[in-house]
């Protein structure tokens, strides 16, 4: 048996002591700071630095998780795009309570989010669609995301048919594809610390919409 934990103490980064400033009244301000610092530390070495884990749950309380790409963040929430007929799309329709995780282990940080997923309005989804490459627009039409695929050949044939159908035309957004916004009600910031004495600060949104922040034991 391989011991993956043997001799990995060099991976543990020392606690910087700057996890979250008391003056930060909104977790989105902290997230923006951390996201910028992550990008600076990452440079060109990480593929898809905007990747985040999205966890959903079906009506029988069976969870599922997958990696999606963060498209935008702000006070309104965290945004991504998807096929509404996919497993995650169906589960969000049945149970909009979701969770996100940003795993930035290369800088010793993690952000965990709990929130309510809502579909973005048509104009916002249209804007995301317009920003995509032509090939990505075609793939949104031909992919029956999460459905059983008989063969890779069939998918490529469907892509080619859609490509020919829209040849020389603007490609409209399919109704089954669009944006989702996760409106957070809990955001937790975790930072690695020496001797496993990590820093955890959790923001919670009250009924009035204001945020409160507490420290959690690591």
UniProtKB/Swiss-Prot annotation:
EC numbers, comma separated? 1.4.3.5
Q: What class of enzyme is it?
A: oxidoreductase
**Cofactors, names only:** FMN
Give the binding site residues for FMN. Answer: 66-71, 87-88, 110, 145-146, 190, 200
Q: Which GO terms describe its biological process?
A: pyridoxine biosynthetic process
InterPro entries with a match to the protein in the record: Pyridox_Oxase, Pyridox_Oxase_CS, Pyridox_Oxase_N, Pyridoxamine_oxidase_dimer_C, Split_barrel_FMN-bd
Q: Which parts of the sequence bind substrate?
A: 71, 128, 132, 136, 196-198
Q: Is this entry keyworded RNA-binding?
A: no
Give the reactions, separated by semicolons, that this protein catalyses.
pyridoxamine 5'-phosphate + O2 + H2O = pyridoxal 5'-phosphate + H2O2 + NH4(+); pyridoxine 5'-phosphate + O2 = pyridoxal 5'-phosphate + H2O2
Q: Which domain of life is it from?
A: Bacteria
Q: Which UniProt keywords apply?
A: Flavoprotein, FMN, Oxidoreductase, Pyridoxine biosynthesis
**Biochemical pathway:** Cofactor metabolism; pyridoxal 5'-phosphate salvage; pyridoxal 5'-phosphate from pyridoxamine 5'-phosphate: step 1/1; Cofactor metabolism; pyridoxal 5'-phosphate salvage; pyridoxal 5'-phosphate from pyridoxine 5'-phosphate: step 1/1
Q: Which Gene3D superfamilies does the UniProt entry name for this protein?
A: Electron Transport, Fmn-binding Protein, Chain A
Molecular functions (GO terms): FMN binding; pyridoxamine phosphate oxidase activity
Binding note for cofactor: Binds 1 FMN per subunit.
Role this protein plays: Catalyzes the oxidation of either pyridoxine 5'-phosphate (PNP) or pyridoxamine 5'-phosphate (PMP) into pyridoxal 5'-phosphate (PLP).
Please name the HAMAP family in this protein's record. Answer: PdxH
Family, similarity comment: Belongs to the pyridoxamine 5'-phosphate oxidase family.
Assembly and interactions? Homodimer.
Do you know which PANTHER family this protein is assigned to? PYRIDOXINE-5'-PHOSPHATE OXIDASE, PYRIDOXINE-5-PHOSPHATE OXIDASE
Protein's name according to its UniProt entry = Pyridoxine/pyridoxamine 5'-phosphate oxidase
